[in-house]
Amino acid sequence: MLASAAALSACGGTGTDAVPTPGATTASDDPRAMQTIVVWRAHVDTLALRVAQLDSAAVALRTDGDVPRVKSAFVEARRAFKLSELALEYYTPTTAKEMNGPALPEVDDEEGPEAVFPPTGFQVIEEALYGDAPVSEREAITRETGTLRPLVTRAQTMMGAQHASDAHVWDAVKLELARIATLGLPGFDSPVAGHSLAEADAALEGVVRTLAPYHAADSTWSRVDSLLADVRAMLNATTDRETFDHFAFLSQRLIPLGQAMQQVRLSMAIGVPAELRPFRMDAATVFDSAAFDAMGFAPIDARPGTPEQIALGERLFHDTQLSGDGTRACSSCHVPEK
């Protein structure tokens, strides 16, 4: 799961806040895709409103009696973010990371180890607001809510100029399902408040609204509708992530949903973007046996290995002569069968 999450971090639409170039198999400004863009813009506008309300509540935080109001505003802002998440992560991944990245300092590889940047966004607010003494963290909370507001404004500007294709809309949905499975359900972005199940449901509501322009009354869609209802019912049956049956949810609900959505996309003859990335464009789910492409991690000018190079790599993987004392190989720890 961790490996999938790491690979997914490299899979957001463009990698930077820019408009993806539609591939040869897609057409930009597809009518249904542009209807979806309108939905996404409305979601981001709602996010801006909720973040402004959160900021106002945080500024008014003075006593313990004010904490529930701030927490309520935080929950609403987070729900608005989750509704917008698939679009923000796909088209403005840099901004999305600033809004919802982990509450950990970050080192810039290009700047060197001395360039350490503090975390920002929702997760920083969450740690302060859901800690032991949120009132004493008022300055930190208001600093972050004040940071969120221009980030959302930036996202509004970028989404206002956005174009889309059917292929990119469906790709964004597929990535969101993978994000729910690998980052949402495990509690990666709700580590303290523990709201991951409710937020996963909000993210799925974003998926439902995103695909509404494509919906049709036929058997392929009825399968998707049924699975979506089952998925959301299971998420809403409990708020306790620790007792939630993650395996059953993934194997019996979310993976079949991804597969059913793939069938709907194919039935509508919607292609996939032409970009190369670790999570294969034509994979139905992140759990497919061939979901990941090693070339997605390679330099842009790299070429696939030849059979001879692959065979050499396999021999070196098991060769103990490469270790200092000649007793260990890569396969000593990394057992391919496991």
Each model region followed by its residue ranges:
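Bacterial signal peptide processing site
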Residues: 11-15
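Electron-transfer interface patches adjacent to heme c in soluble/periplasmic c-type cytochromes
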Residues: 287, 291-302, 324-328, 338
